[in-house]
A protein has these predicted regions:
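Short, well-ordered surface patches within globular domains
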Residues: 96
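Short, conserved phosphate-binding/catalytic loop or strand-edge motifs used
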Residues: 43-47
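Hydrophobic/aromatic-rich effector regions of fungal transcription factors
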Residues: 1-8
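Beta-rich accessory regions
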Residues: 80, 86-89, 93, 101, ...
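Short, tandemly repeated low-complexity microdomains enriched for cysteine and small residues
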Residues: 241-244
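Active-site core of glycosidic bond-cleaving carbohydrate-active enzymes
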Residues: 8, 13-27, 48, 52-85, ...
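Acidic, glycine-anchored loop motifs typical of Ca2+
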Residues: 37-39
Length: 307
């Protein structure tokens, strides 16, 4: 999260202040790698509420994405090229280790074991999809959206339980969009929005159930926004004034737009319009700056520099 935030903020001084802490965290995780190449961790996102083993998929994926973002941030911090190469190599090796260590068949689905020895589906198998690891995208989404995991209130934390946390449902929706499964994702997002924002428990996403009795937390509302920004529009910071776009326009939509995005020390719009069955036109307009247009296939990667 930190390198994504620093890049998107466009604040060089803040990045210089926090870069040493980020480097420390990356080195700490690197020193925690086990013989199989994945980081060991005595806890995870759920802080011991459910089993996580000695090495879990959540920690591994978060570390992986931190390395990827660090390859963009390191040159801006004046680091030698060798540092960027090291982070890139470590990310490549970790991605392969995630597949070897966690990849497998669970409850008949070609997806991920949350930890070594895990034999039931877990909600956080969605995380690889959020970070561009799509080798098992179809099987993972089939599992998450199956009756074994999907309920009226979102995705269960663990197959066979009655516990749900909105954050994993929101990450799964973001991952579904990011992996190119936009039609299924928008269907599930529509149901979620009707249930949460317009239904019996309004007007925000909730934290969990039964713990906390569905109280509201601002973090979940932030994750809802990230379904749109990082999932549907596929925005990924690559510099203080640059980002990549991987726009996923659902087949039933003719257009979509985000207006007045405040990021990269700028104010800009992104609009996607369908121009043919296989092409969309993406327009990026910066207030007081240039307008750029791209005609691409849905999900095609675009590199944007704001100027």
């Amino acid at each position: 999260g930190l390198p994504r935030y620093l890049l998107a903020s466009g604040d060089l001084e803040q990045a210089r202040e926090l870069w040493p802490f980020l480097k420390w965290c990356l080195e700490y995780c690197h020193r925690k790698l086990n013989a199989d190449g994945v980081p060991e961790s005595d806890t995870d996102e759920l802080e011991g509420r459910f089993p996580a083993g000695k090495a879990n998929l959540s920690t591994a994926c978060l570390y992986y994405d931190g390395l990827v973002s660090a390859t963009h941030l390191a040159p801006l911090m004046g680091e030698p090229a060798s540092v960027t190469r090291t982070y890139r190599r470590q990310a490549t090796e970790l991605k392969a280790a995630v597949e070897r260590y966690f990849g497998g068949t669970v409850s008949g689905y070609d997806t991920y074991k949350y930890y070594d020895g895990n034999d039931v589906l877990r909600s956080w198998i969605c995380l690889p999809l959020c970070f561009g690891i799509n080798d098992r995208a179809k099987g993972t989404l089939d599992a998450l959206f199956s009756p074994l995991m999907m309920t009226e209130d979102g995705i269960l934390t663990q197959q066979g339980s009655t516990t749900f946390w909105d954050r994993s449902t929101l990450y799964a929706l973001r991952g579904a969009f990011a992996a190119g499964h936009s039609d299924e994702a928008v269907k599930q997002l529509s149901h979620y929005s009707q249930r949460r924002l317009l239904g019996t428990h309004v007007p925000y996403p909730v934290e969990a159930y039964p713990e906390g009795s569905q109280r509201h937390l601002s973090a979940e509302s932030g994750l809802f926004c990230r379904v749109i920004t990082e999932g549907l529009f596929g925005i990924r910071p690559t510099g203080f004034n640059s980002f990549s776009l991987k726009t996923q326009l659902p087949s039933g939509w003719d257009r979509m737009a985000l207006r007045h995005i405040k990021a990269f020390a700028s104010d800009f719009d992104i609009e996607a319009v369908r121009v043919s069955p296989t092409k969309i036109k993406v327009t990026v307009s910066k207030a007081g700056g240039k307008t750029k247009e791209y005609v691409v296939m849905p999900g095609q990667l675009i590199s944007v520099t704001l100027n």
